[in-house]
C-alpha cells in the first residue's frame, strides 16, 4: 500500500446512499449536488467553472494593471471605455443612433443589403453568418464560408416547437420593451408591441429555412463550393456580390465560397424579394439593438439580461461589470492577453508532463486500433496513418497574433467595438485563399477548454485547463489519466467520431473507410445514439426533454473513447514503472487505481445547472449533460463493473453484449 502520493481524489461529496452502479455521478458528487447553491450571476457551476474563475481573476489582474499603467494601450482603451459608466449613461442612445442611421435611411433593398454588410463587418448580428477557415477539401488553404444566421433565439427549434411557447412570448415582450426604450418603433408608425410581433413573425419565417441541429452536423452536405462571382446567379433575389463588396471581400479576389446551407440561402433570398422593405429594416434595427444592448446605458443592459440571462438561462443576477469588461477585452484581444497570461501562469514543466500524457494516449489508441476485431486491414492502415499525423499543441502558440495595426480610442466604447470587430473581419477576409498558418490557435491560452480541429488534424490544450481538477502534476497518475487524460482521449477521439472519421490524416474531407467497415462503425454508433436518446437530466421533465442522441453523438463517442483509451494509457504508464496490471497498482486512501481513475472523471464533471439553462442546452449543445458524460460512459466500460463490483440489476448495468465498444 502506498499512501505517500497525493491521490488527486476528493471524497468529501460522496453519497453512500447511492450505489456506484446505480448512479456513479451522484455517488461521487451527491452531497455537493444536494447542498451547493449556484452563484446568482451564473446559470451553471462546478469543477470546470472553478478553473474558469481562476483564469478570469488572473486575466483581470493583467487587464486592470495595463489599464491603469497604459490607458492609451489597446487593452487599456477598451477596458476603461467599457468601465466608464458615467460616459455611457451621458451618451445615452446617441452611439446606437449613429450606427443604425443607415438602416433608417435605406431607401432600397440594395442600400439595405450594403448596410447589413457594413454592420456585419462592425460586429453586429445580421442575416448571413460568415467566416474564413481551413478548406475542408483542400486543407492547405483557407476559404470563405457563408452560413445561416438571423435569429435572436438560440435555435430554429424555438420558433416551431410547442414546449418553447412561453419563451417565445417572453421574447416578444422583450423586443417590445427594447423598442419602447429606444422609441424607434415610432419611425415605422408602429407601437412597440406591433413592432415586436412583426419582428418575431419575420424571424419565424427565417427560422423555417434554417437547417436543424442534426442536419447541421453533416459535413458533406454543408460543403457546397460556389465561385463568388456566380453567387447572384446561383442564389437570385439577394445581392450577394454587392453584399460581399461592402463587407470588404471583392468577389473577383475571393475565388470560391463554401455555402454551408444552400437551401437557407435560397429561402432568405426569396424572402428578400417578397417581404416589404419596411419589415427588413425593422428586423435589422432589432439585430443592431440586441447586438449593442450590453454596451448601452443600464436600462438596456438590465432588460437584455432580463431575457437572455433570467428567462433563457435562469441566471438571477447580472455579472459584475469588471467581469463583463474583461470578457469584452478577451473577445477583441484574446492573444494579446494570452501572451501576458502564460508569462505568469504556465510553468514549462506542465508542458513536459502533458506531452508524456498525450504520447501515452496516442500510443494507447495505436494499440487499440491495431487490435480492433471489427475493422479490416485496409481501413486499419488508414486509421493508423491518420493517428500518426496528429499534431499536438499544448499551453500556448509559438507565434502570437500581431495587433499593431489596430488602434483603439480612449473614451469611445462604440468606436472601439467597431474597430476591433472590423480588424478581425478584415483579418479573416484577407487570408481567404492563403496557405494555412500551421501555428494558429483557435482558442486563447487563458481559455478553459480543449479542441480537435478536423481539417488540421490537431488537438489543442490551452494552458488554463491544465490545472486541478483535470490536471495536477503533483497527483498520482490515476487521477490525471481520469481527468486530463480523459480530456486528451476525448479530443483524439474526435478524429475518429462520426464526423472526424470522414477526414483523412491530412485533414481533407475524404472517405478512407471500406463500405463494410463504415457500416459496422455506424452500427456501433447507432447503439450509442439509442442509449443516449433515453436519458433526461435529473432537473428536467422527461415528457418534454430528452438528450438528442444524434446531436450529441460526436461528443459521446469522444467521451466513451476518451475514457476507455485513458484507461489503456494509464496501463502503459504503469508498465513503464514495472507494474503489469491495474490490480497491482498502488492503493491510495483506500481506493484502487481503477477506482481512482473513474472517480477522477466523475469529480471532473461535477456540475449543477439551473433548469432553464438545462432546457436551452439540451436543445442546442452537442455535448450531453454532464451527468451522462459520466454515467453514460462508465456503463459501457467493463473495468468499471470490476472496479466497483457492479452487479446485474443495477440501474447502470448493461449486459456485456450491449456495451458499446468502438475504439
Segments predicted by a language model, with ranges:
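Noncatalytic, helix-rich "gating/capping" subdomain that lines the substrate-entry/channel surface
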Residues: 64-356, 360
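Active-site-surrounding "flap" and adjacent substrate/cofactor-binding loops of secreted or lumenal enzymes
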Residues: 2-5, 18-22, 27-90
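Hydrophobic/aromatic-rich, well-ordered segments within soluble, folded domains that form packed cores
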Residues: 13-34, 158-180, 553, 560-565
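Intrinsically disordered, low-complexity linker/terminal regions across diverse proteins
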Residues: 2, 237, 258, 262, ...
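Extracellular/periplasmic catalytic domains that process cell-envelope and extracellular macromolecules
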Residues: 16-20, 136-138, 452-455, 590-592
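Short, solvent-exposed loop/turn and secondary-structure capping segments
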Residues: 35-39, 130-131, 155-157, 210-212, ...
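Short secondary-structure subsegments characteristic of cysteine-rich extracellular domains
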Residues: 40-63, 188-209, 480-486, 589-590, ...
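Flexible glycine/proline-enriched surface loops and loop-helix/loop-strand junctions
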Residues: 5-9, 152-156, 543
Amino acid at each position: 500500500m502506498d499512501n505517500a502520493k497525493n491521490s488527486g481524489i476528493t471524497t468529501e461529496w460522496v453519497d453512500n446512499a447511492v450505489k456506484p452502479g446505480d448512479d456513479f455521478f451522484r455517488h461521487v458528487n451527491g452531497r455537493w449536488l444536494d447542498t451547493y447553491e449556484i452563484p446568482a450571476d451564473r446559470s451553471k457551476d462546478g469543477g470546470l467553472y472553478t478553473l474558469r474563475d481562476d483564469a478570469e481573476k488572473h486575466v483581470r489582474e493583467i487587464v486592470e494593471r495595463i489599464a491603469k499603467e497604459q490607458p492609451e494601450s489597446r487593452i487599456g482603451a477598451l477596458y476603461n471605455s467599457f468601465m466608464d459608466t458615467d460616459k455611457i449613461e451621458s451618451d445615452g442612445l446617441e452611439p446606437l443612433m449613429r450606427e443604425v442611421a443607415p438602416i433608417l435611411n435605406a431607401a432600397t433593398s440594395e442600400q439595405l443589403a450594403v448596410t447589413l454588410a457594413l454592420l456585419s463587418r462592425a460586429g453586429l448580428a445580421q442575416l448571413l453568418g460568415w467566416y474564413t477557415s481551413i478548406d475542408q477539401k483542400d486543407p492547405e488553404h483557407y476559404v470563405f464560408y457563408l452560413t445561416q444566421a438571423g435569429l435572436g433565439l438560440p435555435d430554429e427549434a424555438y420558433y416551431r416547437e410547442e414546449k418553447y411557447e412561453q419563451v417565445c412570448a417572453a421574447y416578444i415582450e422583450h423586443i417590445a420593451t427594447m423598442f419602447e426604450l429606444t422609441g424607434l418603433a415610432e419611425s415605422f408608425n408602429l407601437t412597440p408591441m406591433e413592432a415586436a410581433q412583426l419582428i418575431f413573425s419575420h424571424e419565424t419565417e427565417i427560422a423555417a429555412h434554417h437547417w436543424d441541429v442534426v442536419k447541421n452536423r453533416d459535413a458533406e452536405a454543408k460543403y457546397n463550393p460556389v465561385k463568388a462571382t456566380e453567387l447572384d446567379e446561383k442564389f437570385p433575389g439577394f445581392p450577394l456580390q454587392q453584399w460581399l463588396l461592402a463587407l470588404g471581400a471583392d468577389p473577383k479576389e475571393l475565388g470560391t465560397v463554401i455555402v454551408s446551407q444552400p437551401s437557407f440561402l435560397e429561402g432568405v433570398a426569396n424572402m428578400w424579394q417578397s417581404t416589404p422593405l419596411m419589415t427588413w429594416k425593422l428586423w435589422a434595427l432589432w439585430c443592431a439593438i440586441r447586438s449593442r444592448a450590453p454596451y448601452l446605458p443600464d436600462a438596456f443592459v438590465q432588460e437584455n439580461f432580463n431575457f437572455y440571462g433570467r428567462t433563457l438561462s435562469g441566471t438571477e443576477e447580472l455579472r459584475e461589470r469588471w467581469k463583463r469588461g474583461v470578457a469584452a477585452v478577451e473577445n477583441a484581444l484574446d492573444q494579446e492577453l494570452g501572451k501576458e497570461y502564460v508569462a505568469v501562469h504556465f510553468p514549462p514543466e506542465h508542458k513536459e508532463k502533458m506531452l508524456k500524457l498525450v504520447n501515452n494516449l496516442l500510443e494507447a489508441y495505436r494499440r487499440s486500433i491495431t487490435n480492433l476485431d471489427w475493422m479490416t486491414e485496409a481501413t486499419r492502415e488508414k486509421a493508423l496513418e491518420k493517428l500518426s499525423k496528429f499534431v499536438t499543441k499544448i499551453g500556448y502558440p509559438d507565434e502570437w497574433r500581431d495587433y499593431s495595426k489596430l488602434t483603439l480610442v480612449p473614451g469611445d466604447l462604440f468606436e472601439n467595438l467597431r474597430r476591433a470587430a472590423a480588424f478581425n473581419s478584415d483579418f479573416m477576409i484577407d487570408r481567404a485563399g492563403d496557405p494555412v498558418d500551421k501555428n494558429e490557435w483557435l482558442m486563447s491560452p487563458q481559455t478553459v477548454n480543449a479542441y480537435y480541429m478536423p481539417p488540421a488534424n490537431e488537438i489543442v490544450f490551452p494552458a488554463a485547463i491544465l490545472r486541478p481538477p483535470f490536471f495536477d502534476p503533483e497527483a498520482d497518475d490515476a487521477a490525471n489519466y481520469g481527468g486530463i487524460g480523459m480530456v486528451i482521449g476525448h479530443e483524439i477521439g474526435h478524429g475518429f467520431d462520426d464526423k472526424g472519421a470522414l477526414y483523412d490524416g491530412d485533414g481533407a474531407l475524404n472517405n478512407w473507410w471500406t463500405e463494410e467497415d463504415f457500416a459496422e462503425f455506424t452500427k456501433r454508433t447507432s447503439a450509442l445514439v439509442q442509449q443516449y436518446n433515453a436519458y433526461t437530466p435529473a432537473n428536467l421533465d422527461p415528457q418534454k426533454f430528452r438528450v438528442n442522441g444524434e446531436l450529441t453523438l460526436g461528443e459521446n463517442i469522444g467521451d466513451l473513447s476518451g475514457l476507455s483509451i485513458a484507461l489503456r494509457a494509464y496501463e502503459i504508464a504503469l508498465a513503464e514503472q514495472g507494474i503489469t496490471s491495474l490490480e497491482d497498482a498502488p492503493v491510495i486512501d483506500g481506493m484502487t487505481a481503477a477506482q481512482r481513475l473513474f472517480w477522477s472523471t466523475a469529480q471532473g464533471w461535477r456540475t449543477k445547472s439551473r433548469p432553464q439553462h438545462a432546457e436551452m442546452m439540451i436543445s442546442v449543445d452537442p455535448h450531453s449533460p454532464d451527468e451522462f458524460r459520466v454515467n453514460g460512459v462508465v456503463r459501457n466500460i467493463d473495468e468499471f463493473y470490476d472496479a466497483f463490483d457492479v452487479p446485474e440489476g443495477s440501474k447502470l448495468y448493461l449486459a456485456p453484449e450491449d456495451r458499446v465498444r468502438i475504439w
